[in-house]
A protein has these predicted regions:
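Selected transmembrane alpha-helices and immediately adjacent juxtamembrane segments
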Residues: 1-50, 124-133, 137-204, 208-209, ...
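Mid-bilayer segments of alpha-helical transmembrane spans in multi-pass integral membrane proteins
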Residues: 95-107, 120, 124, 128-137, ...
Length: 317
């Protein structure tokens, strides 16, 4: 059983690495090469005033755009190609952890019945507010970030051959780092699924869902999103909402929580290659998700209570 789970997890891990690698490799290479052409400097100059609000240089717009339109790995691939400070990388990591892969993950939310404006407002709002706060509150992190396996930059390449070679090196090391994280993660997740430990975890989560203002039947949806993520866990989550009879209110609250904090293992570990502290990143996501969900649930409950009172009041008068 264990061997079968490991084998299946390895296959899924390799397939995932290949799928994501097809994005991160060309993106890393292309973005690196574009730095030595007039294209990237022109884009940077155009939007750098806006990025300054978030405490970022103009170059940082590239990973933000790629991360939100494609996926987190594309955003990280772009970061690996740019010289940024530790503070800038951390701000980007927080922004991308809240808002990434918008097309696919928003599509999942829509299938479950959550309104489009809710998802976009929460994700883009959290990314923007968190970046502004970190920029204002954190005065350190001014040193240049060192990216995991990627060696410190010694000199700027002066020929196109050297530029392409260094770009290929950055892209290849990025894929290696990706494989070292994704493959073991998929093996572990497969073992957890096959041994039904995710089901056990779902039962443990019941008190948590109540504390967040949701019914117990939302727990499997939360577990799938927290462990596998919105994109990979889409099938499980959509099925869980249908089979467990989750109401639209609870589904919306669950997704408000999950857009702030989902795939907690994978979406945290993949930032390791960027050389930033990942524990604060996880705590920011988790605390924000809990606080936001409780606030929205409380406001929603009060609105429902007031709505129930109105007909009675109107009838008695």
């Amino acid at each position: 059983m264990l061997l079968s789970s490991c084998k299946k997890g390895l296959q899924v891990g390799l397939k995932t690495t290949w799928t994501l690698g097809k994005v991160i490799f060309p993106v890393t290479l292309l973005v690196y090469i574009l730095q030595f052409t007039p294209v990237l400097p022109w884009v940077i100059d155009l939007i750098s005033p806006i990025m300054g609000v978030f405490g970022l240089s103009g170059e940082a717009a590239i990973p933000l755009v790629l991360g939100n339109t494609l996926n987190l790995y594309a955003g990280i691939g772009a970061i690996l190609s740019i010289d940024l400070t530790v503070k800038e990388v951390f701000i980007l990591a927080v922004m991308l952890s809240f808002s990434h892969n918008l097309f696919i993950e928003t599509g999942v939310a829509l299938k479950v019945g959550v309104k489009l404006w809710v998802i976009l407002l929460v994700r883009l709002g959290l990314a923007s507010v968190s970046a502004i706060l970190i920029n204002l509150l954190w005065k350190g992190g001014g040193s240049i970030a060192q990216y995991g396996l990627l060696p410190a930059k010694e000199s700027t390449p002066d020929t196109w051959g050297a530029i392409v070679f260094e770009g290929l090196q950055k892209a290849s090391l990025g894929i290696l780092q990706l494989a070292l994280i994704v493959i073991p993660l998929m093996v572990i997740m497969q073992i957890l699924k096959d041994k039904k430990w995710l089901d056990v975890f779902s039962r443990w989560m019941a008190p948590v869902t109540r504390g967040l203002g949701m019914k117990e039947n939302t727990s499997m949806t939360l577990v799938a999103g927290l462990t596998i993520g919105l994109a990979y866990g889409a099938g499980i989550m959509i099925q869980a909402v249908k089979e467990d009879g989750v109401s639209r209110k609870d589904a919306t609250l669950a997704f408000i929580f999950l857009v702030a904090c989902h795939a907690v293992v994978e979406d945290t570990l993949i930032f390791v290659p960027l050389g930033i502290p990942i524990l604060p990143l996880l705590l920011i996501r988790l605390c924000t998700a809990v606080a936001l969900t409780i606030v929205v649930a409380t406001i929603w409950k009060r609105a429902e209570w007031n709505k129930r009172k109105e007909p009675t009041y109107g009838h008695s008068s």
